[in-house]
Every structure is written in C-alpha cells, then in structure tokens.
Amino acid sequence: YKSMSNDLKKYIQLVYSNKLDSKMTSEAFDVIMSGNATDGQIGAFLIALQINGINKNHVLGALDIMQKKMIPVNVPKNSIDTCGTGGDGIGSLNVSTATAFVVAGSGIPIAKHGNKALTSKCGSADVLEALNIKLIADPIELEKCINEINICFMFAPFHHPAMKYVGKVRQEIGIRTIFNMLGPLLNPGKVNSQLVGVFSEEVQTIYGEVLMELNRNKSIIVSGGFGMDEININGENKILVPGSEIKKFTASSIGIKNQNEKDLDGGDAIYNANRIK
C-alpha cells in the first residue's frame, strides 16, 4: 500500500481561487505525474482548471514536466507532425492520419504522434492497427523507420508512461481536459513544425501563444467549421501561423467545391481503414 500525498490539495485550492501560474502548474503536474495524487484529487484539479479556463501559462507549465518524463525519438530536423487535438466529438474519418501518408509520399518526413480513441470510435492508432501496421515502441526502430520510409508513428502511451496515472480519471470524467490540448504539443520527436487541428478558436489562440514560446513558429494551427479539428470543405475555416492573426477562409474561395458532409463520416477502425486505402 502506497500512502498518497496531500500535496495536490493546495494546487486544487489555487486553481479554485484562480491563482495558478506556470511554475505552480509545473509543481502540480509533477505531483500528478509521479503518482502522488489520488484519482479524486486529479479529477477535482482537472475539472476546476477546465471551468476556470486554461491559459498559455498552464499549458507551458504542464509541458515542462511532461517533456521531462517523455521517452524521445531522434527524427530528421525537417520532420513535421499532423496530430490534432481530437475531442471534437464529430467522429469523422482519420483525416490527419491519411494526410500523413500523402505528405510522407511527397518527400517530407512525418513524425506522427497519436493515440487510440478516447472520444471517438476510432483514433489514429486504431486505424493503423486495422491497416496491419504494427505499433513500435523502440525509439531506435522508429528512428530507422522514418529514415527509411519517411514516416513513423509514435504511439503516445509508449512515450508518455506517466500518463498511466491519469488515464482512468480521464475516461471516468469523460470531458475534455488540459490533456486534450497537451497531446499534440508533446511530440516525442520534438518537431519544430506541425500542422495542428484544434476544436475551437479559443484553443487556437492559446496554441498560437504556446508555439511562439516554444519557437515552433513554422507551424500552422487550423480549426474547421462546425467545431471540427480539421479544415472543413464546407464550412468557414480559421488558420493561424504563430505570431500572426487568425485568417478565415472557405474551401470554395480557393476553388474547391462543396462536398457532401456525410462523405467525411467515420465508423469503426475497419471502416476508416478501408476508406484510407
């Protein structure tokens, strides 16, 4: 039996009174990610943070600890990631995973970071398994993979073992938390460029600030119409390069015709895998 520390209690109080800064967020995440908080404390902390509003300091503070506990992979300097936040609840096809194959085929190394589904029927790891692609844990194998075929897939649980302390709580509370925002920022290849899909303009703005602080200013953050974390062919899209203003555009403004929304509907892993083929 391991006695649980009450260390997180003071940070729950700080979130509750809206006084949590970047340094305190790091300290709180250190407690959580070392296994020194109870599930009840973690749930209270995450929900209080969600209700009071997450800002860039919370994200940067959490990232600091998460990166220290991450198992990294050496990837080429010009690698990019196409990992979105997910959590849009729309259940579309795995667009960013399909995109990764196309971009890698065009000669740009893709260090793709992803996970199994939490809020949808099929996450990027689920669809890859349905395509008979083995999830590799060994960083040396992954490095070899990206150098040989221009793409590797880094399965989040292999690289972020400390996430085991929050997995159960996240599933039990079932709402979006700061962890949905952290995933795409925690690429084990420490890529400098990424195409990130987010589910709201508010999150898009925070990402812009965070990516500037991290010097990942060759990134593009997109949010689609109807709350999609992808560029949407039919709705209005918002696109942001860190350090600039959000720009709005529709696919029709660049000559792409509107499509039937239903064509993007996803299903289970087998269905999505067949659509990607």
Predicted regions and their residues:
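Glycine-rich anion-binding loops and their surrounding alpha/beta cores
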Residues: 6-10, 19, 68-71, 92, ...
